[in-house]
Amino acid sequence: GIVIGGSAVITMVTLGNGATLAVQNQISSLGTNLLQVRPGQRMGPGGGGGAAAFKESDAEAIATQIGGIVAVAPEARSGATVVANGRNWTSSVIGSTNAWLLTGNWKLGQGREFSDDELRAGAAVCLIGETVRRELFGTTDAVGAQLRVKQVSCTVIGLLASKGQGAFGNDQDDMVLMPIQTLQRRITGNTRVNTLLVSMNDGADATRVTADITQLLRERRKLAETDEDNFNVLDTKQLGETLSGTTRIMTMLLGAVAAVSLLVGGIGIMNIMLVSVTERTREIGLRLAIGALEREVLLQFLIEAVALSALGGLVGIVLA
């Protein structure tokens, strides 16, 4: 029981701490000092799903009118089947600007970013993630190749460095990034912007920046003082702290459950020692007869119990 209990406690606590660290790393991969602004209310059934989407001009207004900001990236998304080299792959197609790479801590593995002319003109060019490259191009060079998103043929101008799994279990590398004008004009046929990604300066007051963004967007969306916000501003740092706190609580709960095995093991040792005392009555009587003190006999059995527990704990540590 002690072996199993000790091993279970160590394993559960280690797994919990590992999960906490993984969550922190994945949240940090979303971007440093990052705010995500999305349409819809933060709380409540439906979450404001009918709220008006943003416009690209909203991102420009935030970037120019609010201090403490490094970059603002408008983001539009669409799922689509991507075709290249006779292979098909369903992926997430993202429309944005070069600021999207900065806000998300993305690095270029090969190739280049979008040029200003390509962004203005909505050129048929794209950057792809590692998963899309692997599924569509295999071992061949993807940079300079053509791929088709729906009916639009795009030239691959860059390959993004791999980031792996995201904080919510999604594959961050399974994506195609193109200029937002290209996505809106040629893929979705509308000017909706799903998310505004705001990267703040180091040391910026996230609370103040959030309040300034909220006030600016309320004015731009013409909300009355009595109207609730039809958008929400999420601080990824706070999200990371919340998720880390949740995983820590789960770690403690798992450790407590595993500790029950230790309790059961302790009860088992107690029962064994009781049986041992019964079977060794003659030995105890002989020791008392030749002058041993009662506390010395008790100490002997206590040492035996501690030795059994320690041995079981050591074996449990080794097994864990």
Model regions and ranges:
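Alpha-helical membrane-protein architecture signal
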Residues: 55, 236-239, 243-246, 282, ...
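Structural beta->alpha junctions
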Residues: 41-53, 83-89, 159-164, 189, ...
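Transmembrane alpha-helical interface segments in multi-pass membrane proteins
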Residues: 1, 8-12, 255-320
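Mid-to-C-terminal secondary-structure elements
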Residues: 98-114, 123-226
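Peri-transmembrane interface segments
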Residues: 213, 225-258
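Extracytoplasmic
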Residues: 30-34, 49, 54-57, 67, ...
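Hydrophobic, regular-secondary-structure patches
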Residues: 13-92, 99, 117, 134-135, ...
